[in-house]
Amino acid sequence: MTEDWLTLREKLAAAFTRFLETCEQLDPRLHEQETVDGQWSLRDIVAHFTVWDHEATERFWRFLAGPTEDITYNNDEFNARAVAARQHLSYNQAIKELNSAHKGLEEASAAVQPEDLAADGRFVEWLGALSDHYEEHTAQLKRVISQQHF
């Protein structure tokens, strides 16, 4: 199980890196304009990842502290609050905040031991979902990049 956890952590790290690399390829004029499905700017996408990484970090520390109840999230409301709360940030500030939140998630996931994984399957569930989420938005951004005209 430990090997699978390490693989999952590596998968998330790779997905996070690909996301940031893809962000760098986007025309800077689009950082704060609506770009993805006409809904969110790149800054907004970054902001929502910041909050999900922070939430995962908090959940991991709670899981490690002992039994906790499941929480059901309304993803649309959660995302809307995350984006609204960060409208005052520039794109560069949002990236800095994401890097900080992701570092916290890396630290929390590194603290998870084999016995923790055996006791609570939510660690794997969260990390897998985050990896997939980064990949999903990376693919969206790559479509935007392919449509850019320089």
Language-model features, listed with the residues they occupy:
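Short, contiguous alpha-helical
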Residues: 32-77, 114-150
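Generic structural signal for well-ordered, non-membrane alpha-helices
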Residues: 14-17, 21-24, 54-55, 78, ...
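Short, helix-capping/interhelical loops that line the mouth of catalytic, cofactor-
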Residues: 1-7, 55-100, 104, 145-150
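Non-transmembrane alpha-helical segments in soluble domains
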Residues: 9, 20, 43-46, 61, ...
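Short, flexible active-site loop motifs that bind/organize anionic cofactors or intermediates
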Residues: 21, 35, 84
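Hydrophobic packing residues in well-ordered alpha-helices of helical domains and bundles
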Residues: 5-12, 16, 91-98, 123, ...
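Alpha-helical bundle segments that constitute or directly flank the non-heme di-iron/ferroxidase center
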Residues: 1-29, 51-62, 132
